[in-house]
């Protein structure tokens, strides 16, 4: 758990409601209520919920973790479940949504190798939205290059939704790190000629328009 805060009676009550929920619907409601507090004190329980076989509760927990933000990252990364694929996939989605650069390695691996296309897509887009600006100046260029190189690789993914996510991530990176605009333009102008899916081709053209003149 982040910080030195003590669990308040209200948070304790909401945690207990999650732990004692006796139906899928009650569990979802209890998780939503706990997530709505946006309290770092809720992070351990929300992370535990990711292991449950309840997609509705997992979605609510992921949304809550994203709202809590950076304060959730230490616990999330320290408690990645290597034996429970579902929990790890949900945690990866949470990390992608939070945008903390500490998730770089996790998102790179997920974007390139996860067998679930929804996880690869979330990781790819999440890479492009990592807040590398929060890092020390001397680390920023290395992280930018890691993001760019990974997303260029992801553009070869066989699933169009994953390629779409990679293009969205690349666009945001180029908007924030302007020295990537020309390399990205060069890549996309070539890539669009090879892209078989019209919707991805349209996304590429939109990106070229959005990143604007050099």
Swiss-Prot record:
Q: Which UniProt keywords apply?
A: Antenna complex, Lyase, Phycobilisome
Presence of keyword Hydrolase: no
InterPro entries annotated for this entry? Answer: ARM-like, ARM-type_fold
A GO MF annotation of the entry reads: lyase activity
GO annotations of cellular component type: phycobilisome
Q: Could you tell me which Pfam families the record lists for this protein?
A: HEAT_2
Q: Which SUPFAM superfamilies match?
A: ARM repeat
The subunit structure is: CpcE and CpcF associate to form a lyase.
Question: What is the role of this chain?
Answer: Required for the chromophorylation of the cpcA gene product.
The Swiss-Prot or TrEMBL record describes its family as follows:
Belongs to the CpcE/RpcE/PecE family.
Q: What is this protein called?
A: Phycocyanin alpha phycocyanobilin lyase CpcF
Gene source species: Synechocystis sp. (strain ATCC 27184 / PCC 6803 / Kazusa)
């Amino acid at each position: 758990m982040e910080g030195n805060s003590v669990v308040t009676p209200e948070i304790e009550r909401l945690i207990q409601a999650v732990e004692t929920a006796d139906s899928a619907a009650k569990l979802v409601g209890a998780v939503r209520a706990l997530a709505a507090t946006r309290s770092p004190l809720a992070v351990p329980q929300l992370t535990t919920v990711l292991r449950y076989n309840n997609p509705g509760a997992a979605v609510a927990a992921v949304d809550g973790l994203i709202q809590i933000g950076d304060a959730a990252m230490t616990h999330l990364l320290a408690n990645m479940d290597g034996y429970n694929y579902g929990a790890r996939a949900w945690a990866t989605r949470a990390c992608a949504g939070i945008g903390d650069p500490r998730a770089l390695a996790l998102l790179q691996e997920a974007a390139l190798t996860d067998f679930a296309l929804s996880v690869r897509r979330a990781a790819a887009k999440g890479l492009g939205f990592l807040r590398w600006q929060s890092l020390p100046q001397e680390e920023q260029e290395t992280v930018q290059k890691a993001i760019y190189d990974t997303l260029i690789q992801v553009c070869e993914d066989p699933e169009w939704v994953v390629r779409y996510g990679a293009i969205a991530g690349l666009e945001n990176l180029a908007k924030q790190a302007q020295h990537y605009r020309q390399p990205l333009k060069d890549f996309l102008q070539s890539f669009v000629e090879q892209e078989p899916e019209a919707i991805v081709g349209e996304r590429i053209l939109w990106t070229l328009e959005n990143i604007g003149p050099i």
